[in-house]
Amino acid sequence: NLFLKRLQFLKFKLGHERKIKSYQIEQNWYQRHLNLPVNKSFRIPRCYLNISLKEEQIILLEDLDNAGFPSRKTNISIDEINLVLKFLAKFHANYLNEKTNGLWEIGTYWHLDTRQEEWVAMEDSPLKKRAAEIDKILNQSQFKTLVHGDAKLANFCFSKDADKVAAVDFQYVGGGCGMKDVAYFLGSCLNAN
């Protein structure tokens, strides 16, 4: 089995430029990995086909369910959290000081430049007052790498016995501090309790 991602640009309304660009970024990411052997230190789907046509793009990927990663989690154990953190550490180490060519300059879906409406809506607080400073520190990190950019729990696929993990959804991959992925992942594992 294979997994087909097909995006038809005509279906997007005006004002969705960032969303369209995110799919182009993902296509660029998979172009870097087209027909490469499977990376054993961190698992992503193999890309078999990556084409752009006039009004659509098509990416043909390995089906991770058939590759031994059929499980998706909504609740996660400490061991599974550690497994994902090890994945992210290997991912970030592999791409340390990598150029962002064709990817987001500032990776991640959530960064201050893209979340101004949410920032304005926040109640006055120390976090709101220091948001620009925190964002600047993260963006000027000495140890830049490529970040997954949307490292939430839903974007990780687990083996049946939960001793291996793979990542999907690379629409917001780009440059940054690896802690952005770590913080977003850990936050996605929390619930109201």
Predicted features and spans:
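ATP-dependent phospho-/nucleotidyl transfer catalytic cores
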Residues: 67-149, 153, 157-161, 166
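Conserved protein kinase catalytic core
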Residues: 11, 68-69, 156, 175-177
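Active-site activation/catalytic loop segments of kinase-like enzymes and analogous catalytic loops
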Residues: 28, 175, 179-193
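Short hydrophobic-acidic sequence motifs that mark active-site Asp/Glu residues
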Residues: 3, 60, 146, 167, ...
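Conserved ATP-binding subdomain of kinase catalytic cores across diverse folds
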Residues: 2-109
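Short conserved micro-motifs at the rims of enzyme active sites and ligand-binding pockets
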Residues: 15, 158, 179
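Secondary-structure capping and boundary motifs in well-ordered enzyme cores
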Residues: 53, 80, 143, 148-150, ...
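Activation of the activation-loop gatekeeper triad in protein kinase-fold domains
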Residues: 169-173
